[in-house]
Design a protein with these regions (language model features):
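C-terminal membrane-solvent junction of multi-pass transporters and transport-like membrane proteins
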Residues: 195-240, 275-292
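Inter-helical loop and helix-membrane interface segments of multi-pass membrane transporters/permeases
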Residues: 1-19, 69-90, 155-186, 223, ...
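Extracellular/periplasmic helix-exit of transmembrane alpha-helices
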Residues: 55-73, 117-118, 132, 136-175
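Membrane-interface loop-to-helix entry segments
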Residues: 13-62, 67, 71-75, 217, ...
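Hydrophobic, membrane-embedded alpha-helices of multi-pass small-molecule transporters
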Residues: 1, 15-23, 27, 59-64, ...
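Transmembrane alpha-helical segments of multi-pass small-molecule transport proteins
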Residues: 7-32, 51, 194-196, 225-243
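Membrane-interface alpha-helices at helix entry/exit sites of multi-pass transporters
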Residues: 13-14, 120-136, 223-232
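Select transmembrane alpha-helical segments in multipass membrane proteins
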Residues: 18-21, 51, 83-103, 140-142, ...
Length: 292
């Protein structure tokens, strides 16, 4: 869907074709198993994140004088009396929590599937590593993106064009399209880089979630080559279906599914809290003794 916006296509057929290409690419990778998944993601994810961060830092650094005003605008607009009066704060918080959960999976219990595959002597050490993911993903990368867009708008670049979109030069932009326009203003031709980054983000995310899904599938239906292949074909089919669907439908479905994971996971975390505490204390004790 994001690729449709970035490439300028606006049809179900175009989305399905993009989804088909992605499905073929992801299919080649996931049929190779977890070793190939690890080898692909460990190279792709750091590379794309580094490129994106460098581009953001360049834009922010080139307009460093606007940083104070940008943060001031974020804080004042979030808590101004008008927003409080119309209940906008609650709406923003709800959307913020939804998008944060969507971007970093915090509380969904999905990341633990990948981290549990890591061979480590102490489970708590891997848990601490996992804590870095939401910070880097949401606090660092998302904040940088927001600053780039806000700095771009200080020149009066766009106006509000309805729910989820803004008007730039008479054209309605949504989602990644706004980011692409902001990047292109300061780094000409960067929309192609951003399109590449989105592809890499999307492919790596689909690869990771395919692994989460196959582990859940095995738990429910048992291990077997036929069962595994059925799941993988279903997963690839939904890549095409999702690419052809509308953005609103995808957000609604994703929010519902994430809530369906978060609710039982929170209950599980509550009952497993004593175990987590025990493992953490054991790990901290080892670290303390090592320092002594």
């Amino acid at each position: 869907i994001v690729l449709k916006d970035l490439l300028g296509y606006d049809s179900t057929f175009a989305g399905a074709m993009i989804g088909l290409i992605l499905a073929i690419l992801v299919g080649i990778i996931i049929i190779g198993g977890i070793k190939r998944i690890a080898s692909v993601t460990e190279k792709v994810v750091p590379f794309m994140a580094l490129l994106y961060i460098i581009a953001c830092l360049y834009i922010i650094g080139s307009n460093f004088s606007f940083i104070d005003d940008a943060f001031k605008l974020i804080i004042t607009e979030a808590f101004n009396p008008t927003a409080i009066g119309v209940g906008s704060i609650m709406s923003v918080l709800m959307i913020g929590f939804q998008r944060a959960a969507f971007s970093n999976e915090a509380g969904a219990g999905s990341a633990s599937i990948a981290h549990s595959a890591v061979k480590t002597k102490y489970a708590a050490s891997e848990g601490l590593v996992a804590l870095l993911e939401p910070f880097i993903d949401t606090v660092v990368i998302c904040t940088m993106t927001a600053l780039v867009i806000i700095i771009f708008n200080f020149s009066g670049a766009f106006m509000y064009g309805g729910e989820g979109g803004v008007m730039i030069d008479g054209v309605l932009y949504e989602g990644a399209g706004i980011t692409a326009k902001a990047f292109d203003q300061y780094i000409p031709g960067s929309e192609y880089f951003l399109t590449t980054a989105v592809v890499l983000f999307a492919v790596s995310t689909m690869i990771s979630w395919s692994y989460y899904g196959i582990q859940s599938w095995k738990y429910l239906f048992g291990k077997g080559k036929v069962a595994d292949m059925v799941y993988k074909l279903m997963f690839l089919a939904f890549i095409v279906i999702g690419s052809a669907a509308s953005m609103n439908s995808i957000w609604a479905f994703s929010d519902a599914m994430i809530f369906a994971m978060v609710f039982p996971n929170m209950i599980g975390l509550y009952f497993l809290f004593p175990v987590v505490k025990e493992q953490l204390n054991k790990y901290l004790k080892v670290i303390k003794e090592a320092k002594v």
